[in-house]
Amino acid sequence: MKSVRALIVDDSSVMRKIVERALRQAGIDLTQVFEAGNGAEALGVLQGNGVDLILCDINMPVMDGLEFVKQLSGVEQARGVPVVMITTEGSESHVVQALSCGARGYIRKPFTPDQVKEHVMPLLAANS
């Protein structure tokens, strides 16, 4: 599998590092990791950078993860890039809402590297 450029969007800098570590422990070859603290920051990051994978929280200030995913359709650099939500929101309605907004995966916090691998690897393989 090719090396991956990932964007991790979460309002917690600690959680962004935990997600990055989980990706690496899952065996994903990360060549570049971009970070953003909310959806608006993430849209700014995408304006100048192409990525292969986006992992995003739902509950964030300024612009939440669901609104961010909705707005991705208007960002050329994000077309076709798989988005996986990683969040504490675990209700069925949140999962359905995230998937209907355009997310391709949903992982509940807390999570293990194996769960990240299980959700992310098929998406990366399909996009390679």
Descriptions of predicted regions:
Residues 11, 109:
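A Lys-centered signature of the CheY-like receiver
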Residues 13-34:
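Two-component/phosphorelay signaling modules centered on CheY-like receiver
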Residues 35-53:
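Acidic, metal-coordinating helix/loop segments flanking the phosphotransfer/catalytic sites
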Residues 60:
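Receiver (REC) domain active-site loop signature in two-component systems and cognate sites
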Residues 84-86:
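Hydrophobic/aromatic residues positioned on beta-strands within the core alpha/beta folds
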Residues 111-121:
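C-terminal output helix
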